């Protein structure tokens, strides 16, 4: 299957988006998160540290093959991955930096080193208060000329959680990763919810061998953390959009790890949309389409949620006609919650946003507008 190549304007927006973990692009609290984690692990292990950054456009091979993803795996699908060309992608994980970095350190094999790889990653994801299409991740790989096993892995988990969230309750669930053995998902309790902050496991021996680090001498631990989620927990933020806010009252609080003080509580405006879309469309794909259509104005959307999906054959004929549903389509009831972080939107502004979302997603032949666009049709 031919991949869907990213449009030039979407590519430009992606590669010029500020990486909040990079001090060269200005200070941000996410940098403090990286510093605190790195310092805690270095103190625990007394190991060397190597921080590494790389351009977000990577060969497909680095993002998947070298990490032992199966050739026909679903993760490679253009529904989840943003292709720059047939052979390059915007990295979906900071783990894409690891195989090449392992080859570099194999030239002068370490006794004990922690690889620290922060940066932006790019997903096609849903829109809500916890998700963004461009989250920040941190890969941490400890490589040592000694056996590293489950005890060291759990020590790593405890050190990271205690460094940022002292006393927090956390749990680990078994999960499979192609580049680890005995993988785990890490969740932290936040009130009545469990929030995933990352995944980890023992480094896959084959990856070390392929990099020139024989497993007869070397072993490794691998961990990937969601930095945005961690910062939200530390500062008790309720909305991920605050991390990129340009309002001085919000941005000024994104420079440290102190608790966040809400600027204001804007009222939520809800709009429900009845859409005809291809039967293969996913919630993540719909969210990504909205981001591409609205650009920076997506910051005014708190969430975009699929409420119901109905196959064409189960939709009443009059309803099919009303939305112009055709063959190979399904009816999606979508709820958008419009709430700007710093100002109250007018009903007219909310309707215009609703219509732009509708225009980006609806694939039927009949249209139902809410704002002035409908008056001009």
Model-derived features with residue positions:
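A carboxyl-terminal module marker
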Residues: 178-190, 194-377
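Short histidine-centered catalytic/ligand-binding loop motif
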Residues: 21-26, 138-150, 271-279, 346
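Long, well-ordered mid-to-C-terminal structural blocks that present hydrophobic/aromatic surfaces
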Residues: 140-141, 145-146, 162, 230-232, ...
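Extended C-terminal subregions enriched in glycine
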Residues: 150-155, 159-184
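Long, charged, glycine-rich C-terminal linkers/tails
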Residues: 47-62, 170-177, 302-306
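Class II aminoacyl-tRNA synthetase-like tRNA-binding/catalytic domains
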Residues: 1-131, 142-143, 194, 199-208, ...
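Short secondary-structure junctions
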Residues: 41-48, 109, 161-169, 293-304, ...
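Amphipathic alpha-helical segments
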Residues: 30-44, 152-165, 285-294
């Amino acid at each position: 299957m031919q991949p869907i190549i990213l449009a030039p304007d979407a590519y430009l927006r992606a590669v010029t988006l500020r990486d909040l973990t990079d001090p060269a692009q200005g200070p941000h609290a996410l940098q403090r998160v990286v510093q605190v984690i790195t310092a805690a692990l270095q103190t625990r292990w007394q190991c060397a540290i190597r921080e590494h950054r790389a351009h977000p456009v990577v060969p497909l091979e680095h993002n998947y093959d070298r990490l032992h993803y199966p050739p026909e795996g679903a993760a490679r699908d253009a529904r989840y991955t943003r292709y720059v060309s047939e052979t390059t992608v915007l990295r979906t994980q900071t783990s894409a930096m690891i195989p090449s970095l392992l080859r570099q350190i194999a030239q002068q094999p370490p006794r004990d080193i922690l690889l620290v790889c922060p940066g932006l990653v790019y997903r096609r994801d849903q829109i809500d208060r916890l998700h963004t299409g461009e989250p920040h991740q941190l890969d941490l790989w400890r490589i040592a000329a000694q056996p590293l096993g489950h005890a060291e892995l759990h020590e790593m988990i405890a050190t990271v959680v205690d460094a940022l969230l002292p006393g927090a309750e956390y749990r680990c669930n078994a999960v499979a990763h192609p580049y680890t053995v005995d993988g785990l998902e890490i969740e932290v309790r936040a009130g009545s919810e469990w929030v995933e902050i990352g995944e980890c496991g023992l480094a896959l021996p084959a990856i070390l061998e392929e990099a020139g680090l024989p497993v007869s001498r070397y072993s490794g631990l691998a961990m990937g953390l969601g930095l945005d989620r961690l910062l939200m927990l530390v500062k008790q933020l309720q909305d991920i959009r605050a991390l990129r806010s340009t309002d001085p009252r919000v941005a000024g609080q994104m420079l440290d790890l102190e608790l966040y003080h809400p600027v204001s509580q804007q009222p939520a405006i809800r709009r429900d949309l009845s859409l005809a879309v291809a039967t293969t469309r996913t919630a993540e794909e719909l969210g990504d389409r909205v981001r591409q259509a609205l650009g920076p104005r997506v910051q005014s959307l708190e969430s975009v949620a699929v409420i119901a999906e109905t196959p064409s054959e189960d939709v009443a004929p009059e309803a099919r006609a009303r939305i112009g549903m055709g063959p190979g389509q399904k009816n999606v009831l979508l709820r958008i919650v419009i709430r700007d972080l710093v100002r109250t939107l007018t009903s007219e502004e909310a309707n215009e946003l609703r219509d732009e979302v509708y225009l980006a997603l609806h694939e039927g032949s009949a249209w139902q507008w809410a704002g002035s666009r409908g008056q001009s049709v």
